[in-house]
């Protein structure tokens, strides 16, 4: 399973390069297509693990003026 991440930046917030570095440090990789980043679980995560990942993304982006959307899919 993979979790896709779409980010929306504010012009008054952190630069995209900083956001990308933070997300890559959190285990996400840049993604070509309709999403900006992808997290590859390598297996089906539990609901708790999915919620923990969302919490980590929120904590990582806190104070950076970034909105985000997560979506998981089997692929």
Residue ranges and their predicted role:
Residues 1-4, 10-75:
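Long, contiguous binding/interaction regions
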């Amino acid at each position: 399973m993979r979790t896709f991440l779409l980010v929306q930046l504010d012009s008054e917030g952190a630069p995209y390069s900083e956001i990308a570095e933070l997300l890559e440090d959190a285990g996400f990789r840049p993604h070509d297509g309709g999403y900006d980043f992808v997290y590859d679980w390598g297996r089906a995560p539990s609901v708790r693990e999915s919620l923990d990942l969302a919490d980590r993304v929120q904590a990582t982006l806190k104070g950076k003026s970034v909105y985000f959307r997560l979506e998981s899919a089997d692929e």
